[in-house]
C-alpha cells in the first residue's frame, strides 16, 4: 500500500465497507489547474464556515486522512438525478477559481457535496479485475471473484464542468517503497463507471490484466532543437542511412550537387560588396532549370551559400519600407555570365563616408545606402549572430528538408578533366563549350567499382548483310561512303565509351557535335543522304542501343555489389538527366529527317532510364549492406521475424495469390536461416537469384513473352507477401521495422531486375530495353519485341519545342 496523499471524494465504491477501502489516486494535473489544491481549498472553506477556529485543524485532518476515514460520521449516498446534474454546473462555478468573485456570496457547502455518486459505480463494477485487499494487503488475481468492497483503485481522472474528459492528462501510476526506490506500473485501463455529483464528473479506472500489452509505450516528446550542440545536426542513424563511427559528424550533403557548388565557384567570389539574397536565389533557380535539377528552398540554399563561402554576414539594406536582406562579403566575378541578369547597382564609394543625415535629399540616400553600409562595416569586426548560436538549430525548414551543406569527402574534388587526356591526339574534339557540366575526378574506389580496366567492346550487327540490301542509284553516294560512315560511327562509339570510362561527361556533347556537323571524317551531306535509308537508320539505332547498354554495364557492372561513391552516383544521375539535351543540340547540326530524330531521342531515353534505376538500386544495396554488417541489428531482425505468424500470412495471401505452401515455407525458412547466420550481401544476392531460377525453371525454353507474363505474376505475388509481413511487423511495433522496410525495398527492386534479365536473355535484347515495350511505333523497320515506341504525346519528343525543326 502506498502512503500517497489522498484526494477527497475522487473515488469510492461502497458505503457498507468504506473503512476497508483506500483509494490510491495520483494527482491529475493540467495547465493552470491543480486538482489537489482545489479540493483542499474547498474543504477548508467548508470548515471555516462551520468553525473558523477549527479551520487549521480541519485542514490538517484532510491532508492526513482519506475521505473514507474523515470523522464526519455515517456517510450518506447521494443518487444521481436530473436535479443533481443541474446543480453540478452551479456548484462547479462556485469552486472554480476562474469564476469566483468577491461580489457573489459563497454558498454554504457540506463535506457530503463533494462525494461521487457511488450507487452508479456499484452497478457497473466488473466482476473481476486486479485489485488489492486492505485486510491482508494481497493483490488479487484477475480470474478470482473479488468483493468490490475491498478494492484499491489505481487511478482516477476528474473533469470539471463542460471540459472534455479527453483533455485531462493521464498520469502513470507509481509507488515509493521504504527502501527509497520508485516503482512504476504500466497497465491498460478500462472505464467502468461514471458518477455525476453536484460538484463534477468523476471517471474511475482500473487495470485490465486480462489483456496483454500489445504496443510498447514510447515517449513521443522530443527535446528542443535549441538544446543540440552543433548548428547543423546530422540526421540520426536509421536503416536507410547507416553511418559508421567515422562519419557521424559529417554534415549531410545529399542535396548539394557538385554542379551547384561548381557553379557558385565559377560565378561568385569573396570580396567587398553585397548581393541581395532574392537575386542570388533567382540565379540559382535558373541554374537548376537549365540543368534539370530540383532546387532546394531559400533557407536551404542559404545554408549552402554559407557552407561554400565562409564568414558571410547578412545585412538588411535599403530605404525604409523597401529594404531587402543582402549577403555582405560576396560579389559576382567579372567573368560571370550572370551580369546580364544583375540589376544595375551604383559603384561602391572607396574614399569618403558621408553620414545619411548630411545627404541633401532622400533619393541620394536611397542610391548610396548599400555603399554606405558596406564602407561602415568594412573594417569593423562585428560579432555575428550566427556565431553566438553555434549550438542552436536552424528554422523548421532545416528539419523538413535535407541540409545541403557541403563537405566533400576526401579525393572527391571537382575539376575539369582535359579532353586530350581521354581522346587520342589524332582525333581531338572541338574545345569544350559546356562549362556548366562538372567533370568528376575518378578515385581508386571508383575505378575498382567499374570492374573492367580495358575499354569494353561494343557488339555490332553484320555489316555485309546490311550492304547487300541497299541500292545506291538515287542517293548520289556509293559503297565507299557507306563503309566510311559505318567505320567512323564505330570510332565515334568507342570514343564516347572512352569518355564515359574516364567520367568526362562534359565532352560527350562536343564529340557528338563534331560527328553530326561533318568534322569527324564523313561529310555532313553524305550522312544526311545515307540516314534517309531505313536500313541505315536501323543499323544506327541498334548500335546506339548496344552502346547505351555497354555504358550502363561500364558504370555499374553489378547493380547489387558495385560500391559506387556518393559523388560518383550523383554524377551519373546528373549525366542521365542531361544526356538527351546533349543529343538534341548535336542533331541540330545535321539535316536529318524528323522520324529518325525521334527514334534517336527515344533510344537515348533507355540510357536515362537504366542509369536512374540502377543507381537507385545500387544505393539501396549500399544502405542495406550497412544494416547487414551490424550484428546487433541483424539479431534484432531475427528476434522480430520469428514472432511473425507465417501461417496466418500464407492463409491470407495464399487465398489471393494461390502460391504453393511448400515453396512459401521454404522461402520463409531460408530467410530466417540467413538472418540467424548473419549472411553477407553476396549470400543474400545468391538466395534471391535462386528463388527466381526456381520459379522460372520450367519456362527456360519458352518465348520471351511467356517468361515475361510468368515473371510479372511472380513479382505481384512476391510484393503482396512481403507487404503482409511488413503489416504484421507494423502491428507488433517491431523495433527493427525500419531495417525490414529497407531490406524489403532492396529485395523487391532486385527481383524486378532479375526478371528483366531473364526476359532480355530470352528475347536476345539489351537489358535496358525491356521496360516500356510498345509495338505501335517501332524504332526499326522490322520491329522486335523489345523495341520501344516513341509516344506522340510526349513533349520531350516534340521536335518543334526542342528547336530541332
Curated annotation (Swiss-Prot):
InterPro entries: DNA-bd_RFX, RFX-like, WH-like_DNA-bd_sf, WH_DNA-bd_sf. Keywords: Activator, DNA-binding, Nucleus, Transcription, Transcription regulation. Residues 260-334 bind DNA. One of its GO terms (molecular function) is RNA polymerase II cis-regulatory region sequence-specific DNA binding. One of its GO terms (biological process) is regulation of transcription by RNA polymerase II. Residues 1-113 are annotated as: Disordered. Probable transcription factor. May regulate some genes of ciliated sensory neurons. May activate the expression of the shared components of sensory cilia, but not the cell-type-specific expression. Together with transcription factor atf-7, involved in regulation of the serotonergic response of ADF neurons to pathogenic food. It is found in: Nucleus. Ciliated sensory neurons. Belongs to the RFX family. Its main location: nucleus. Residues 1-14, 93-104 have a biased composition (Polar residues). This is RFX-like transcription factor daf-19. It holds the Pfam family RFX_DNA_binding. Residues 19-92 have a biased composition (Basic and acidic residues). One of its GO terms (cellular component) is nucleus.
